[in-house]
Amino acid sequence: MGSETLSVIQVRLRNIYDNDKVALLKITCHTNRLILLTHTLAKSVIHTIKLSGIVFIHIITSSDYCPTSDIINSANFTSMPILQNGGYIWELMELTHCFQTNGLIDDNCEITFSKRLSDSELAKYSNQLSTLLGLN
């Protein structure tokens, strides 16, 4: 498998209901299998939760190529439309513009989101995450 290297993938988040609003997510992962990581991201579920003014972006994946703990990223986004009313959970539906002929991943890789979960599911996840982070 070879030695693992630290790879950074920048992904633009787009709100399908307001295409003018985007945010940038930087995923850092120790892996030497970027193509497989990209395939994994295409099947992942991305959670975004705003707690105490901080936006937590959590990518849920069962990938062996990039453990979940390595791709949890937190940032203080001030204008992220998918976080209205405290946060939405979106399912990753499409991963485009991510492959180059040389096998590298394009820095402008774009993700399209869909499928907002119910408020009860969102509240349950928010409570679990808040407990995990020690914020309640």
Swiss-Prot record:
Its main location: host cell. InterPro entries: Pneumo_NS1. It is found in: Host cytoplasm; Host mitochondrion; Host nucleus. The keyword Lipid biosynthesis does not apply. The keyword Ligase does not apply. One of its GO terms (cellular component) is host cell mitochondrion. Transmembrane segments: none annotated. It comes from the Viruses. Pfam families: Pneumo_NS1 (PF03438). Signal peptide: none annotated. GO terms for biological process: symbiont-mediated perturbation of host apoptosis; symbiont-mediated suppression of host adaptive immune response; symbiont-mediated suppression of host cytoplasmic pattern recognition receptor signaling pathway via inhibition of IRF3 activity; symbiont-mediated suppression of host cytoplasmic pattern recognition receptor signaling pathway via inhibition of IRF7 activity; symbiont-mediated suppression of host cytoplasmic pattern recognition receptor signaling pathway via inhibition of MAVS activity; symbiont-mediated suppression of host cytoplasmic pattern recognition receptor signaling pathway via inhibition of RIG-I activity; symbiont-mediated suppression of host cytoplasmic pattern recognition receptor signaling pathway via inhibition of TBK1 activity; symbiont-mediated suppression of host JAK-STAT cascade via inhibition of STAT2 activity. Keywords: Host cytoplasm, Host mitochondrion, Host nucleus, Host-virus interaction, Inhibition of host adaptive immune response by virus, Inhibition of host innate immune response by virus, Inhibition of host interferon signaling pathway by virus, Inhibition of host IRF3 by virus, Inhibition of host IRF7 by virus, Inhibition of host MAVS by virus, Inhibition of host RIG-I by virus, Inhibition of host RLR pathway by virus, Inhibition of host STAT2 by virus, Inhibition of host TBK1 by virus, Inhibition of host TLR pathway by virus, Interferon antiviral system evasion, Modulation of host cell apoptosis by virus, Viral immunoevasion. Monomer. Homomultimer. Heteromultimer with NS2. Interacts with the matrix protein M. Interacts with host ELOC and CUL2; this interaction allows NS1 to form an active E3 ligase with ELOC and CUL2. Interacts with host IRF3; this interaction leads to the disrupted association of IRF3 with CREBBP and thus reduced binding of IRF3 to the IFN-beta promoter. Interacts with host MAVS; this interaction prevents MAVS binding to RIGI and inhibits signaling pathway leading to interferon production. Belongs to the pneumovirus non-structural protein 1 family. Plays a major role in antagonizing the type I IFN-mediated antiviral response by degrading or inhibiting multiple cellular factors required for either IFN induction or response pathways. Acts cooperatively with NS2 to repress activation and nuclear translocation of host IFN-regulatory factor IRF3. Also disrupts the association of IRF3 with CREBBP. Interacts with host mitochondrial-associated membrane (MAM) MAVS and prevents the interaction with RIGI. Interacts with TRIM25 to suppress TRIM25-mediated RIGI ubiquitination and thereby RIGI-MAVS interaction. This is Non-structural protein 1. It comes from Bovine respiratory syncytial virus (strain A51908) (BRS).
